[in-house]
Amino acid sequence: MDKQQLASTVNKVLDEMRQRPIPIGISSRHIHLAAADYARLFPAQPIQPKKALLQPGQYAAEQTVTLVGPKGRLNNVRLLGPLRQTSQVEISRTDARILGIAAPLRMSGNLQGTPGIRLISPFAELELSGGTIVAQRHIHMSPLDALILRVSHGDSVAVAIEGSDRRLIFDNVAVRVAPDMRLEMHIDTDEANAAGADAAQAWATLVTKP
């Protein structure tokens, strides 16, 4: 096989890899807590992992809280671990309407100017001064995944949701690259419902490049 044939074969394999299915994680409403806020809501209670998530070291905990807004409340909202530097509440647009909170669309961690919310646990209540967002849809990936897919951290791409009877293309999907990340697209329950997506059966494919 000469160099031209080898290059052609490599490019063909890479093109096939770029079309491989991307797993979908459907994010229900959940919270992340800073250590001090966790200690106040769950005094002397160690975090109890309930289910491991696809991203390494991350998990859904046994602990839940109630979210309370000006217009309503949402019960049994799951805590995700491990603990973070800053508390954050992630909800859908539908949840925001129920609560009566004008939660902005943000990437995780971009919390400046976000509204607060009241959290109630079985042990205590806590009023957060900010940190409530609707999470922007995004894809986690490793540097190798990014190299294969020809994207970079911070890029915005379009992604097709496949495997349902309501195939949908989402624009403005943020790319998040880190060495410890596994390939996975995250959408919220509103977005999953719009696409008729079930995490066990649906998948995503990259359809445009930045």
Swiss-Prot record:
Annotated pathway: Polyol metabolism; 1,2-propanediol degradation
Primary location class: other
TM annotation in the entry: none
Protein's cellular compartments: Bacterial microcompartment
Domain of life: Bacteria
Keyword list, A-Z: Acyltransferase, Bacterial microcompartment, Metal-binding, Transferase, Zinc
Binding sites annotated in the UniProt record for Zn(2+) 2: H138, H140, H186
Its EC number(s): 2.3.1.222
The family this protein is said to belong to: Belongs to the PduL family.
Biological role: Involved in 1,2-propanediol (1,2-PD) utilization within the bacterial microcompartment (BMC) dedicated to 1,2-PD degradation by catalyzing the conversion of propanoyl-CoA to propanoyl-phosphate.
Protein name as annotated: Phosphate propanoyltransferase
Species in which this protein is naturally found: Klebsiella pneumoniae subsp. pneumoniae (strain ATCC 700721 / MGH 78578)
